[in-house]
């Protein structure tokens, strides 16, 4: 991993790298697919991809804002029908669609890619993606099927999410901790709290239930 994004990013120290590698070996030994996204650019991306492949990961590099589709073809691009994570050879994470001025331009840009796995936000503006829109995104441009996943943060709450209550800005509930200085509008969540769990799952209005 790298401590900072960009072409001049410096690697983590050896102790940190070994700790992370030890954690990631556990799912690998259990036969699970492991995905790595490093915030790097330029020639560093190829290094990340090759390093990940050597370690048994599906690894890629990208901008930390996660707001663009790379202007390069996916690594190991293929026409396979991908229905399980163990079949995935490449992936794209795009969580911030602000560069796409219309809903259709956003969906069109995603549908014209050949990634085996797309990880996107449930919402564009203030409306969740519809069943028809998600079905559209489950097809690669080359005709193969792919997996579509929705991002959901468990460790942080955000004031732009539909569960947010305006009163929390002045007085945060006990399960809502300090703001994240690197991401305005985001707050650390005490993820073990039942009140936070109730917002995330278990009712028709809960975030995970909307995804499902």
Name these PLM-found stretches:
Residues 1-212:
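Glycan-processing catalytic domains of CAZymes
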């Amino acid at each position: 991993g790298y401590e900072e994004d960009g072409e001049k990013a410096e690697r983590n120290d050896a102790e940190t790298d070994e700790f992370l590698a030890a954690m990631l070996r556990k799912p690998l030994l259990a036969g699970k697919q492991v995905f790595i996204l490093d915030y790097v650019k330029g020639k560093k991306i190829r290094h990340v991809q090759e390093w990940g492949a050597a370690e048994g990961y599906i690894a890629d590099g990208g901008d930390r804002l996660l707001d663009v589709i790379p202007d390069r073809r996916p690594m190991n691009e293929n026409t396979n029908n991908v229905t399980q994570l163990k079949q995935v050879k490449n992936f794209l994470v795009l969580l911030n669609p602000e560069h796409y001025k219309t809903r259709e331009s956003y969906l069109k840009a995603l549908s014209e890619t050949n990634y085996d796995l797309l990880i996107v936000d449930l919402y564009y503006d203030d409306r969740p993606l519809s069943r028809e829109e998600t079905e559209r995104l489950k097809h690669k441009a080359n005709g193969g099927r792919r997996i579509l996943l929705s991002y959901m943060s468990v460790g942080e709450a955000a004031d732009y999410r539909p569960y947010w209550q305006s009163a929390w800005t002045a007085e945060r509930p006990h399960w809502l901790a300090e703001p994240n200085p690197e991401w305005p509008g985001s707050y650390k969540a005490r993820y073990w709290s039942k009140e936070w769990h109730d917002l995330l799952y278990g009712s028709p209005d809960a975030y995970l239930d909307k995804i499902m």
